[in-house]
Amino acid sequence: MENNAWKIIYLATIFSLVVLGLAYYLMSPRDPAHLLEEKTEKMAEFFGTRVEGRKDGRKLWEFNAEMGWTMKNQDASRLINVRSGRIYNKKGYLTVTNLTAPWAMVNPRTEIIEAFGQPEGERGKPSKLKALIDLGKLSSNNKQDWSTIIADHILYNSQHNFSEISGKSQLIKRDSRLFADAISVDHELKKAKLSGHLTLRRRDGLIRSAFGDYFGETERLELFGGVTFEAKEKGTKATTVRARRAVLFSDIDREIELSGGVEASQGKKLSLADNGVYSRRGKKLFLSGRTRTVIEKAQALIKPETAEKLRNQDVRQILRAKTLLTSDSIEFSTTSGNARAAGNVIVTQKGKEAKAETAYYDDQKELLTMRGAVQMKKGEDWLNCGKVTIYVSREVFEAEGMVEAKFKL
């Protein structure tokens, strides 16, 4: 009997312990799966310190971060709230500096370093990733010679010395700010390839294109794939130029070269040409190569189909109601809106026609004056004139000098 009593007590004790253990398990807080995973992946943690990575005696990177840890497999280290960072290429030269980011990941084995513009799980918020990047002028102490990068993500590959920058990327140089979806930088060539919704903001206007190449040593930017340049600056006439290709520089006082199906519009004037040069310093736009210019009356507006008709050489409808000027070249002032055409100048308007060496257009008076070997057509004959004045709004041709009498058409 006594043995049975002890057995009952023993079994009851075991049962009680099992129940208590189960209750403790069910009631005790448990770490979420991602925290358990995070704990198991950490080998070493550090807080508020400077950390660096080296390989074969050379420095790869150096960061000041609020905190971070090294993975147990030692393949990568994660850094949180990077206050400043430096990245070096395989030759030991500084490539990226002044880097700040919510977090970064470095992999010593692959020599790949990544920085991110938003904390994990907070995509879509404004990026806090910013850095100065080597694009040819990094040796200068003048910070204006450095290129500033703002983006959602930067990946730098030290072995191949290139960077991939993506997500609402910005490349800032002096007074210019270039926006793109993606920027690929070859640090060996000091060259950046840009793609996706390119927009360049400068003090003198706005430029858009599909693709572009930036050459850091010469600070030259080549844009292609539907280039549109809107020249807008205080004290100038709004001028829009479209072309297939454009070449420009970080120094906005240097000229912008445009080529391939150039189309320029300024107020009542629309021109098509093979090539163009825009000069901010000279306050002018120069077009050359088979230029065709339509000049409307003050109350009229340039319609989109007008450019298409000029491009297709379908000028019959234009000749009925507009003033058409063809020449070897034409130059527009971006301040007054006046224009000067030169070389094989021909002006037609409602059946009237005149030709000369040069023509000057006064935008305010809507007056076109032709000079130099001037000829005006009267019937089937061409009459030599000293000058022909064309009143665009009144649709009148007036010839004078070296003719039998002054006359109007």
What do the PLM-derived regions correspond to, one by one?
Residues M1-L409:
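Mature-chain termini and adjacent capping regions
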